[in-house]
Regions:
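Generic marker of "main functional regions" within proteins
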Residues: 25-29, 34, 59, 72-73, ...
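Short alpha-helical "patches" and their helix-cap loops
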Residues: 32-41, 91-104, 116-118, 152, ...
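Glutamate identity and glutamate-enriched acidic tracts
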Residues: 36, 40, 55, 89, ...
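C-terminal accessory domains and tails appended to enzymatic cores
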Residues: 3-4, 11, 15-22, 43-46, ...
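Short, surface-exposed loop/strand segments
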Residues: 1-62, 69-70
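A basic- and aromatic-enriched beta-loop-alpha substructure that forms the phosphate/nucleotide-
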Residues: 47-133
Length: 283
C-alpha cells in the first residue's frame, strides 16, 4: 500500500526512528511530519506512524515498540520497519551495527555498554559529529518535504541501506553458486572462478559468505578473479599466517605481491598453475 505521510514523535530524536523514517522515505517518497498522532492517524493505513502511538500494526503501517513488555527481546521502530520491508534477517546478518542499535534504544547506554563488554565512556568516544548534527536537525524539524536538504539526506540513507542489503544478498547468492572450497592439509581454500562478465569487485562479499556457511576460521586463503587482469588474486583470509605471498614475487607470472605478504596478483588463468603458486606461498 502506498503512503501519503510518515509521522513520528516530536522532541528529541534517536537513530531508530530516524533510520526507520529514512527507509520509508526511500520507498514511498512522501513528507515526514513530527507530531503526536491522533486516533485518525493510527487508523489510516496511508499514514506510517513510527516510534509513537503505542501500537505495532504493520497492516496499518503503525510501527511503535514502546508498548512491548520490559523483558521483550530488544526490538525498536527500525526493527519493525525492516521486518515490514522483508529485509530484517539480512540486516541482522549483514549490518553489525543493528543489534547494538536495538539494545541502545530499548535498554539504554549503560546496559548496552555492559552487553558489549565495554564501559560507557568508550561508547561516548565513538560518537560522530555527523550523527549529532543529523539527529539534532531532525529533532528540530516539524515538517520535511521531498526536495528539502534534510529530507534528501534521509532518503539517501534509507536508499543506500536498502541497496546494500539487496546487492549483498544477490552477491552472496552468486558466490554460493560459484565458489569452491578446496581442502589443503589441515585447512581450506576458497576458490572463485572467473565469470563473464565479472562483478565490479570480484572479492566483495567473500568474508560474509564464509561467515554464513560457518567457515570463517577454517579457510586460510582466497583465490578470486583479478578485475584488472586476466588472472587471479590470491590473499590471506583473516590475515592467516599460513601463507606469505612475498614468496612468489619473483615468479614470472606474478606481477604484484604486497610487501607485507597478504596479497598477490597473477596473470595465470590455468587452475593448475594457480594451485602451484599457492603451494609456493605456503609458509
Amino acid at each position: 500500500m502506498s503512503l501519503n505521510l510518515i509521522l513520528t514523535h516530536p522532541g528529541g530524536s534517536h537513530k531508530d526512528e530516524l533510520l526507520a523514517c529514512s527507509l520509508l522515505a526511500a520507498v514511498h517518497r512522501v513528507p515526514i511530519v513530527r507530531r503526536e498522532p491522533t486516533p485518525e492517524d493510527l487508523a489510516d493505513p496511508t499514514i506510517a506512524v513510527v516510534d509513537v502511538g503505542g501500537e505495532h500494526a504493520p497492516e496499518r503501517n503503525n510501527f511503535d515498540h514502546h508498548q512491548f513488555p520490559a523483558d521483550h527481546p530488544p526490538v525498536c521502530a527500525l526493527s519493525l520497519v525492516l521486518q515490514h520491508l522483508g529485509v530484517y534477517e539480512d540486516a541482522r546478518q549483514f549490518c553489525d551495527w543493528l543489534e547494538p542499535a536495538e539494545w541502545f534504544d530499548t535498554r539504554g547506554p549503560n546496559v548496552t555498554a555492559k552487553w558489549l563488554g565495554v564501559d560507557r565512556n568508550t561508547m561516548t568516544k565513538l560518537n560522530s559529529p555527523i550523527d549529532v548534527t543529523v539527529l539534532r536537525r531532525f529533532a528540530k524539524a516539524k515538517h520535511l518535504e521531498p526536495g528539502e536538504p534534510l529530507w534528501e539526506i534521509l532518503n539517501y540513507i534509507g536508499a543506500d541501506l536498502l541497496e546494500y542489503l539487496r546487492e549483498l544478498r544477490t552477491r552472496l547468492d552468486s558466490i554460493a553458486q560459484q565458489a569452491q572450497i578446496w581442502t589443503v592439509d589441515d585447512h581450506e581454500i576458497l576458490f572463485l572462478p572467473r565469470t563473464d562478465p565479472l562483478p565490479d569487485e570480484p572479492s566483495a562479499g567473500i568474508d560474509r559468505y564464509l561467515a554464513t556457511i560457518g567457515k570463517a576460521t577454517s579457510v586460510a586463503a582466497l583465490i578470486y578473479p583479478d578485475r584488472r587482469g586476466s588472472g587471479y588474486g590470491l590473499s590471506r583470509h583473516n590475515d592467516n599466517p599460513l601463507y606469505d605471498f612475498t614468496r612468489i614475487d619473483k615468479q614470472p607470472d606474478v606481477h604484484f605481491a604486497h610487501a607485507r605478504g597478504f596479497v598477490a596478483k597473477t596473470s595465470a588463468a590455468e587452475i593448475g598453475r594457480v594451485k602451484e603458486l599457492l603451494g609456493l606461498a605456503r609458509v
